[in-house]
C-alpha cells in the first residue's frame, strides 16, 4: 500500500473517531424574546427524562419559577432541573456566582422541600465570583445613567445560591447534594461586586440600563479585564485568594472611592463559604464530556434570552453575557457538534422588563390586559413587565442567530379573552420601505414602523385543554400562523402554569 493511501486511511480512521466520539447530544432551551418566556417550565418538563441539566451563562439576575407537585419554586442561580431528584444539575464556567445569594437560594428552597443538593449539584471551578462590591458599583453605574434601564444578565454569588437552595428545600425539593453540579471554572460574584454594580448605575446620571444590581456586569467586567476571581481559586491556597481579593478590592476602591469594604470580615466570611461550597465543585468540562461519551442525556437551560444577548440583543439594553447558542458552547466548554435540539421558547405575546426599544409595545388597554392576565411581574426585579403583540421580525432574527429546531409557545391562554389579535409581520422604514433585516442600532430600531396582521381571537378558555386538536380552531390557526411565518415547527403549546398544561402538538 502506498504511503498516500496509508495516510488517507489513517486520516479517515481518526476523522471517524472524532465525529463519533460522543454517544449523545446536548439539547438546549433558549428564550427567543426578551426573557420571561417560560423557559423554566419547559426545562422542568424535559428534565424528567434527562440525566444532567446545566446553566451556562448569567448569574442570579435572572429568575425562573417552576411549579412541581403543587409547590412553587423560585430559582435564580440554581438550574430548574434541581426539582428532579434523578438528575444532576451543573452550574457552568460561564456563570458568575454571588455566594451569599447562592447559599440564600439553597436555604429558601430547602425550606420548601428541596433536599440533598450536595449530591446532585456541581459548580464549575472556573466560574467567576461576584462580590458585594460588584453589586454596589452596579447600582452606582445605573444611577449615573439616570433613568433608562437595560434589563437583565452564569457567575455565582454563593450566599444567594445556598439561600435559594434552602428556600426550595423547604418547599419539598430534596437530595440536591446528589444531583447538582457546579463547574469548577465558574466565576464567583462577591458582595462588593453587587455594591459596585449599584454605584456604576448611579454614576451614569442620565441614561440607565436597568441593571438588577446583582453585580453581574461588574463581575463580567472583572473577568474580561483578567482580575476576576474564580471558584477554584477560593478552594486553593487561601493566602493567594486573600491577596487577589485585596487587589481587586483596591482596584474598585480607586475607581469608586465611596464604596466601603471590610476586607478582613469579607475574607473570614469567604473562608467559611469555601468549606460550604467545596463539596459541590469540580471540573465540569471533564464531567460533561465524559457524560456525553457515555451516552448521558444533557439539557441546557438558557438564562435571560436572545434579545438580551450582549452581541445580538438590543445593545446597550442587554445583559453582560452571551445568552444565545454561542454562550452554551463557551459557558460549558462544549464543541459545536455536541448540540442536538435547539428549542426556542416563545411567549404568545411579547414582554420585556426595564427600558429599551420595544416595537410592538402596547401602552393602552391591550397592554394592561396582557400585564394583568399574564401576571407580568419580574421574578428578580419585581417590576411590571411591558407588554405588546407578538413580533415575527424579532423572532426570525433570533431564530437566524440560534438555529431553532423547534419552538414551544407559552401562555397562549392569556389571549383567550381577545376578540382579535395582532401580530407584527414586518418592519418598515419611515419612507415605507420594508426592512429585510433586524435593525442593528437603537436609533434605527426606534425609527421603524410596524406592519401588523390581524387574526381572529377565540374568546374561549383554553386552560383545561390538553390536546392540540381540542383547542379552538382560531387558537390552532394562531399557532400555525407563527409556525408558517418562522418556518420552524411548533412542538409544544403552553396554556397554564404547571408542566401538565404544556400540550404536545405532534
Curated annotation (Swiss-Prot):
Its main location: cytoplasm. One of its GO terms (biological process) is 'de novo' AMP biosynthetic process. GTP binds at residues 35-41, 63-65, 385, 411-413, 494-496. Mg(2+) binds at residues 36, 63. InterPro entries: Adenylosuccin_syn_GTP-bd, Adenylosuccin_syn_Lys_AS, Adenylosuccinate_synth_dom1, Adenylosuccinate_synth_dom3, Adenylosuccinate_synthetase, P-loop_NTPase. IMP binds at residues 36-39, 61-64, 212, 226, 304, 319, 383. SMART domains: Adenylsucc_synt. One of its GO terms (molecular function) is adenylosuccinate synthase activity. PROSITE patterns: ADENYLOSUCCIN_SYN_1, ADENYLOSUCCIN_SYN_2. The active site is at 36 (proton acceptor), 64 (proton donor). Homodimer. NCBIfam families: purA (TIGR00184). Plays an important role in the de novo pathway and in the salvage pathway of purine nucleotide biosynthesis. Catalyzes the first committed step in the biosynthesis of AMP from IMP. This is Adenylosuccinate synthetase. It comes from Drosophila yakuba. The lineage of its organism: Eukaryota, Metazoa, Ecdysozoa, Arthropoda, Hexapoda.
Amino acid at each position: 500500500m502506498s504511503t498516500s493511501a496509508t495516510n488517507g486511511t489513517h486520516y479517515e480512521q481518526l476523522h471517524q473517531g472524532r465525529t463519533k466520539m460522543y454517544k449523545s447530544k446536548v439539547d438546549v432551551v433558549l428564550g427567543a424574546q426578551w426573557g420571561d418566556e417560560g423557559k423554566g417550565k419547559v426545562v422542568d418538563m424535559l428534565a424528567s427524562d434527562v440525566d444532567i441539566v446545566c446553566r451556562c451563562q448569567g448569574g442570579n439576575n435572572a429568575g425562573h419559577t417552576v411549579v412541581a407537585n403543587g409547590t412553587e419554586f423560585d430559582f435564580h442561580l440554581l438550574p430548574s432541573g434541581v426539582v428532579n431528584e434523578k438528575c444532576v444539575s451543573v452550574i457552568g464556567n460561564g456563570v458568575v456566582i454571588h455566594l451569599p445569594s447562592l447559599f440564600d437560594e439553597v436555604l429558601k428552597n430547602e425550606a420548601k422541600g428541596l433536599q440533598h443538593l450536595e449530591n446532585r449539584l456541581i459548580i464549575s471551578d472556573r466560574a467567576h465570583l461576584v462580590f458585594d462590591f460588584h453589586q454596589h458599583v452596579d447600582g452606582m453605574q445605573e444611577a449615573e445613567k439616570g433613568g433608562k434601564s437595560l434589563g437583565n444578565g452564569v457567575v455565582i454569588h454563593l450566599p444567594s445560591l445556598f439561600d435559594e437552595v434552602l428556600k426550595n428545600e423547604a418547599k419539598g425539593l430534596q437530595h440536591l447534594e446528589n444531583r447538582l453540579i457546579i463547574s469548577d471554572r465558574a466565576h464567583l460574584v462577591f458582595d462588593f461586586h453587587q455594591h459596585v454594580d449599584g454605584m456604576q448605575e448611579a454614576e451614569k446620571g442620565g441614561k440607565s440600563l436597568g441593571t438588577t444590581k446583582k453585580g453581574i456586569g461588574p463581575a463580567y467586567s472583572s473577568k474580561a479585564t483578567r482580575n476576576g476571581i474564580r471558584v477554584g481559586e477560593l478552594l486553593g491556597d487561601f493566602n493567594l485568594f486573600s491577596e487577589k481579593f485585596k487587589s481587586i478590592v483596591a482596584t474598585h476602591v480607586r475607581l469608586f472611592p465611596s464604596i466601603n469594604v471590610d476586607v478582613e470580615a469579607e475574607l473570614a466570611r469567604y473562608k467559611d463559604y469555601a468549606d460550604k461550597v467545596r463539596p459541590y465543585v469540580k471540573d465540569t468540562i471533564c464531567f460533561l464530556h465524559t457524560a456525553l461519551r457515555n451516552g448521558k442525556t444533557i439539557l441546557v437551560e438558557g438564562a435571560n434570552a436572545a434579545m438580551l444577548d450582549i452581541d445580538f440583543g438590543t445593545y446597550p439594553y442587554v445583559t453582560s453575557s452571551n445568552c444565545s447558542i454561542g454562550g452554551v458552547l463557551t459557558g460549558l466548554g462544549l464543541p459545536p457538534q455536541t448540540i442536538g435540539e435547539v428549542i426556542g421558547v416563545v411567549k404568545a405575546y411579547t414582554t420585556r422588563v426595564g427600558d429599551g426599544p420595544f416595537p410592538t409595545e402596547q401602552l393602552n388597554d391591550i397592554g394592561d390586559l396582557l400585564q394583568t392576565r399574564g401576571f407580568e411581574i419580574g421574578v428578580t426585579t419585581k417590576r411590571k413587565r411591558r407588554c405588546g403583540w407578538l413580533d415575527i421580525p424579532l423572532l426570525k432574527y433570533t431564530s437566524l442567530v440560534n438555529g431553532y429546531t423547534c419552538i414551544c409557545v407559552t401562555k397562549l391562554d392569556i389571549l383567550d379573552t381577545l376578540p382579535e389579535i395582532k401580530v407584527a409581520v414586518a418592519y418598515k422604514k419611515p419612507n415605507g420601505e420594508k426592512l429585510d433585516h433586524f435593525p442593528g442600532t437603537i436609533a434605527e430600531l426606534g425609527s421603524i414602523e410596524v406592519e401588523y396582521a390581524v387574526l381572529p381571537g377565540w374568546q374561549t378558555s383554553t386552560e383545561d385543554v390538553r390536546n392540540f386538536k381540542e383547542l379552538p380552531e382560531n387558537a390552532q390557526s394562531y399557532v400555525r400562523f407563527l409556525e408558517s411565518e418562522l418556518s420552524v415547527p411548533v412542538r409544544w403549546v403552553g396554556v397554564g402554569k404547571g408542566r401538565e398544561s404544556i400540550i404536545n402538538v405532534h
